[in-house]
């Protein structure tokens, strides 16, 4: 059965401010559609992609280009260097500020991204435990290696382990950090206080997603993913957790001579397709978007937003 959330008072109140969410798996076309919608409704885009929060990571995260950012103002891009982790709580604080500014300025706010937990935390008002980063513990966990860390998390907090990809070192370390700092699993410490918004969720899930992912991966390598990875490795070292994520991990192996470029492209494509499958499962269980048609998502999204704005 799909997960459903109880309707909040704000959701029922047609006078509550409108927050539009465009969600979908990686390579589903969110960026292009978001730009069209933002221009049509005079909105600014608030990023909800966890890797795009970091500086110096543009190619591998498919961050909106400088030209696209010049068309529409974007928030929550390039917040910090990649060696300074951003917690879920810190993301919420930054995102809430951007949402409130947009509501005051435009009368509506526009969230775009595929990081399901970040979207859920913001729109449902989840309150994760306030635990400061523990650099010494993170270094120890990095030395243990991501496979063992994820196994430890699966034993101690299986609910969190199901939500966190086995290769996601940053979120695995954060969940273990909370566990060791507080003595209780993160999944049992999160409360909810829904914000006073009406949330309109629009979803993209194209039938040709596998082909889109394959084309996206080829484009990342042709646009300079390996060189971007080289620069990150030189500045921050090969153990940087974000360099273990999809795309960067394979490019790192190319630089080390452990993978050929064609093999890296194939491996990145496969991992991305697996990740997209997990994203779609999350969206089905944790969100209730209006799924947009493949043939004309812009018209349907525009109609729904116009109705929401009244």
UniProtKB/Swiss-Prot annotation:
Q: Which GO terms describe its biological process?
A: tRNA modification
Cofactor(s) needed for function: Mg(2+)
Q: Where does ATP bind?
A: 24-31
Record flagged with keyword Glycoprotein = no
Task: Report residue spans for region: Interaction with substrate tRNA.
Answer: 49-52
Might you give the EC number(s) for this enzyme? Answer: 2.5.1.75
Signal peptide boundaries: none
The top EC class is: transferase
So what does this thing catalyse?
adenosine(37) in tRNA + dimethylallyl diphosphate = N(6)-dimethylallyladenosine(37) in tRNA + diphosphate
Positions of the site: Interaction with substrate tRNA?
115
Q: Provide this UniProt record's keywords sorted from A to Z.
A: ATP-binding, Magnesium, Nucleotide-binding, Transferase, tRNA processing
Read off the Pfam families from this record: IPPT
What InterPro entries does this protein map onto?
A: Dimethylallyltransferase, IPT, P-loop_NTPase
Coiled coil spans: none
Q: Enumerate the GO terms in the molecular function aspect.
A: ATP binding; tRNA dimethylallyltransferase activity
Q: Where does substrate bind?
A: 26-31
UniProt lists the family membership as follows:
Belongs to the IPP transferase family.
NCBIfam families assigned = miaA (TIGR00174)
Question: What exactly does this protein do?
Answer: Catalyzes the transfer of a dimethylallyl group onto the adenine at position 37 in tRNAs that read codons beginning with uridine, leading to the formation of N6-(dimethylallyl)adenosine (i(6)A).
Subunit organization: Monomer.
Q: What is this protein called?
A: tRNA dimethylallyltransferase
- Organism equals Synechococcus sp. (strain WH7803)
């Amino acid at each position: 059965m799909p997960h459903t959330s109880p309707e909040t008072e704000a959701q029922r109140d047609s006078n509550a401010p409108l927050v539009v969410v465009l969600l979908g798996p990686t390579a589903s076309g969110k960026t292009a559609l978001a730009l069209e919608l933002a221009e049509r409704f005079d909105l600014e885009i608030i990023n909800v992609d966890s890797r795009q929060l970091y500086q110096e990571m543009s190619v591998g995260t498919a961050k909106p280009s400088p030209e696209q950012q010049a068309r529409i103002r974007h928030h929550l891009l390039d917040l910090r260097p990649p060696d300074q982790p951003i917690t879920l709580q810190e993301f919420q604080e930054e995102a809430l500020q951007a949402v409130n500014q947009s509501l005051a300025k435009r009368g509506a706010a526009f969230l775009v991204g595929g990081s399901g937990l970040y979207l859920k935390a913001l729109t449902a008002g989840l309150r994760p435990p306030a635990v400061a980063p523990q650099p010494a513990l993170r270094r120890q966990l990095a030395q243990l290696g991501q496979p063992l860390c994820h196994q430890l998390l699966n034993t101690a907090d299986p609910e969190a382990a199901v939500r966190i990809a086995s290769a996601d070192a940053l979120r695995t370390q954060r969940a273990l950090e909370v566990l060791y700092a507080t003595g209780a699993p993160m999944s049992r410490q999160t409360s909810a206080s829904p914000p006073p918004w009406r949330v309109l969720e629009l979803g993209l899930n194209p039938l040709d997603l596998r082909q889109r992912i394959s084309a996206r991966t080829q484009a990342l390598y042709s646009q300079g993913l390996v060189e971007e990875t080289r620069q990150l490795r030189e500045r921050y070292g090969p153990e940087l957790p974000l360099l273990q994520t999809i795309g960067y991990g394979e490019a790192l192996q190319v630089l080390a001579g452990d993978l050929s470029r064609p093999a890296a492209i194939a491996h990145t494509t496969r991992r991305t397709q697996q990740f997209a499958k997990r994203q779609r499962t999350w969206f089905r269980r944790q969100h209730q978007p209006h799924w947009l048609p493949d043939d004309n998502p812009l018209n349907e999204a525009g109609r729904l937003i116009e109705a929401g704005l009244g």
